[in-house]
């Protein structure tokens, strides 16, 4: 019990000093170039990503599949799954991050300039994990579950590092929109 108290106190102090909110993140998108008559003639990508504006543009099966595989308690918790986090910590197997935590990690990565700083966003440390927990809780206070899912679907790489967003991956791998998955 005394060892637990010795660990809990510094963790609590560390927690207090962590930010609760993410800085605004701008994510690369597709730009369509128009000629003098307004006719599109090229698309330029700052990232290989097609953003959707509504969850209605994604099939219910894709949404259900994401929640079932990544975070079955997504609609019950306020930022992270206690059982998933505890399971990952006790088994020392990694993982355990729910949808909001994964989103926060990705948004931090996009927000950090330079490879060294981006490495900090994904390094496997207890400090990073604790920071993600607090940021995920803060993110869930500001955003609805639907907003979180939509942002997740628009920012995560599906299937390969070059297929960011479910729409891009759906078109690339299946030749159809995400609404038809």
Predicted features along the sequence, with ranges:
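N-terminal type II signal-anchor transmembrane helix
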Residues: 1-32, 40
């Amino acid at each position: 019990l005394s060892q637990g108290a010795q660990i809990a106190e510094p963790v609590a102090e560390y927690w207090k000093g962590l930010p609760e909110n993410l800085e605004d993140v701008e994510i690369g998108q597709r730009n369509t170039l128009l000629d003098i008559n307004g006719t599109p003639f090229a698309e330029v990508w700052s990232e290989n990503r097609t953003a959707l504006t509504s969850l209605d543009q994604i099939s219910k099966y894709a949404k259900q599949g994401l929640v079932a595989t990544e975070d079955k308690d997504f609609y019950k918790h306020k930022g992270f799954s206690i059982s998933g986090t505890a399971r990952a910590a006790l088994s020392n197997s990694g993982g355990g991050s729910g949808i909001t935590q994964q989103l926060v990690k990705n948004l931090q990565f996009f927000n950090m300039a330079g490879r060294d700083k981006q490495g900090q966003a994904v390094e496997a440390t207890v400090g990073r994990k604790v920071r993600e927990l607090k940021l995920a809780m803060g993110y869930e206070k500001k955003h609805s579950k639907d907003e979180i899912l939509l942002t997740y679907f628009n920012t995560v790489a599906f299937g390969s590092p070059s297929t960011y967003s479910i729409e891009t991956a759906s078109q690339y791998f299946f030749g159809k929109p995400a609404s038809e998955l």
